């Protein structure tokens, strides 16, 4: 408890004494400790708990009370305050100078801040400075920069175990080259690109190349840039020509879409060249040629009817399609062809000219495929034996050489009966019938056998009825007709090997064998 002081001391403590006592008081024990305040509070409570009659000191007026220290104790800075200080430092750094910064200054600043990932931040700063072209102005040698930078970095091996060998990738002695920004596609990838993607690729590549040239880069022009520039110039020329030609186009259909413009830029087509309009016809492709001629006569390349006339400004050839066909028209049959080569090949049929001659037998042909097929007969391949006399006979692929084949006139005629077919395969099947008809059954004439197997009751397509010559009965299949014919001839070609009985059908012979299998064998009692 407080003891009363002497009378010599004044009852009221002066302000100077209170200030001196506060200075001599010990500081707080810890930045987070509030023990000083707790002591003051405890002293105050103990003083209030004393009886007022035992308190001998006179209470000081409120105006003369010593001022208490109401300031908060010292507390460690939080992360939020540290971030605010970093922001102020960064703003001060940005406003400090507008000159170009070197890579070393950026690295030092990054090390002072101690970011979470030093390698990633340094690489990002290097890429930004490299894109602005500032590293070329740095006068410090590259080797010295690498050494200083690696020495200044933290040496904690556990945090950056593999950073030493990455130092050579942080600083380069030269600026960016064209190979760094080159987007290289293989021919297969270029062919798979669409027209819009190809145009975008050309624009990006040329823009990157021109940007590097504008920055003062000195290097030879790559081959891909030369090709892209030629393609760009051709595209611009084609667009300008198309604009000039289509200025006089009629405005009846102003919203008519022009499809395929991008494909035309990549694959130029000259409208005056007839070879580009019609594909080359191979040998024996008259049906394709006829269809292409009909399509050309019905519509021009832009889809308009040539009979309606040509509007001014439409990209057409100087001569119409009908006038062009007049030059390729046959004088004998008035048939038109797309090219002069097809016309000359067709005229050989009328003139009888056969320029392709066999060197072994001196037989001439007017088409090369016919000569090639004929030469296979001399090699001895594709032969088979005759059923009766075992004489070598030519296969069906070579039988057409003995027939007058008019491939250009779209029909194939049999030399034996004069029957014509639209396809060569049907003629070969017909010739097989003639070869099979030579094997005659006993007592049957050649003409009768042919009628039994191949005569049709009706001529129109879809009815395949076979009629018997003896009784007039009609069958839908040849096999039924042959079985019916055996009833007239009493032919029984199927003979049992056990008893020698003959049958006209294989099903009858099968049933007969079943009867033999059901017979029970009789055992001899003696043996």
From Swiss-Prot:
The keyword Metal-binding applies. It is found in: Nucleus. Residues 1-104, 247-322 are annotated as: Disordered. Transmembrane segments: none annotated. GO terms for biological process: regulation of DNA-templated transcription; regulation of transcription by RNA polymerase II. Pfam families: KRAB, zf-C2H2, zf-C2H2_4. Residues 176-246 form the KRAB domain. GO terms for molecular function: DNA binding; DNA-binding transcription factor activity; zinc ion binding. GO terms for cellular component: nucleus. Residues 1-16 have a biased composition (Acidic residues). A zinc finger (C2H2-type) spans 328-350, 356-378, 412-434, 466-488, 494-516. Keywords: DNA-binding, Metal-binding, Nucleus, Repeat, Transcription, Transcription regulation, Zinc, Zinc-finger. It comes from the Eukaryota. Its main location: nucleus. May be involved in transcriptional regulation. This is Zinc finger imprinted 2. The lineage of its organism: Eukaryota, Metazoa, Chordata, Craniata, Vertebrata.
């Amino acid at each position: 408890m407080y003891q009363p002081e002497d009378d010599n001391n004044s009852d009221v403590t002066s302000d100077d004494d209170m200030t001196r006592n506060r200075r001599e008081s010990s500081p707080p024990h810890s930045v987070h400790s509030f023990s000083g305040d707790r002591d003051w509070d405890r002293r105050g409570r103990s003083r209030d708990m004393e009886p007022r009659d035992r308190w001998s000191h006179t209470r000081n007026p409120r105006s003369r009370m010593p001022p208490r220290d109401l300031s908060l104790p010292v507390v460690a800075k939080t992360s939020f305050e540290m971030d605010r200080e970093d922001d102020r430092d960064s703003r001060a750094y940005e406003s400090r100078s507008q000159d170009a910064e070197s890579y070393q200054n950026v690295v030092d600043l990054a090390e002072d801040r101690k970011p979470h990932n030093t390698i990633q931040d340094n690489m990002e700063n290097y890429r930004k400075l490299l894109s602005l072209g500032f590293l070329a102005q740095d006068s410090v040698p590259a080797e010295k920069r690498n050494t200083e930078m690696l020495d200044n970095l933290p040496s904690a091996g556990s945090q950056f175990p593999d950073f030493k060998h990455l130092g050579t990738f942080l600083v380069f002695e030269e600026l960016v080259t064209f190979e760094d920004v080159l987007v290289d596609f293989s021919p297969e990838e270029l062919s798979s690109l669409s027209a819009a993607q190809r145009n975008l690729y050309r624009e990006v590549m040329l823009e990157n190349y021109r940007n590097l040239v504008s920055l003062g880069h000195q290097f030879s022009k790559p081959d891909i840039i030369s090709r892209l520039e030629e393609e760009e110039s051709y595209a611009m020329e084609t667009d300008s020509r198309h604009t000039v030609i289509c200025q006089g186009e009629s405005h009846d259909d102003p919203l008519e879409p022009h499809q395929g413009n991008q494909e035309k830029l990549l694959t130029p087509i000259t409208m005056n060249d007839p070879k580009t309009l019609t594909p080359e016809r191979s040998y024996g492709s008259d049906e394709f040629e006829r269809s292409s001629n009909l399509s050309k006569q019905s519509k021009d390349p832009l889809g308009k009817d040539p009979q309606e006339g040509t509007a001014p400004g439409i990209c057409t050839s100087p001569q119409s399609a009908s006038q062009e066909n007049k030059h390729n028209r046959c004088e004998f049959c008035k048939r038109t062809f797309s090219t002069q080569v097809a016309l000359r090949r067709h005229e050989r049929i009328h003139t009888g000219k056969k320029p392709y001659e066999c060197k072994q037998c001196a037989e001439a042909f007017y088409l090369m495929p016919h000569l090639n097929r004929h030469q296979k007969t001399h090699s001895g391949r594709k032969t088979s034996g005759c059923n009766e006399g075992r004489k070598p006979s030519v296969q069906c692929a070579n039988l057409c050489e003995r027939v007058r084949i008019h491939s250009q006139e779209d029909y194939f005629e049999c030399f034996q009966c004069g029957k014509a077919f639209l396809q060569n395969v049907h003629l070969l099947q017909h010739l097989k019938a003639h070869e099979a008809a030579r094997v005659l059954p006993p007592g049957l004439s050649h003409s009768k056998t042919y009628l039994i197997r191949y005569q049709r009751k009706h001529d129109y397509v879809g009815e395949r009825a076979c009629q018997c010559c003896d009784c007039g009965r009609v069958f839908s299949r040849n096999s039924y007709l042959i079985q019916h014919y055996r009833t007239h001839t009493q032919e029984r070609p199927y003979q049992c090997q056990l008893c020698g009985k003959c049958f006209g059908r294989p099903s009858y012979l099968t049933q007969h064998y079943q009867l033999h299998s059901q017979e029970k064998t009789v055992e001899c009692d003696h043996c």
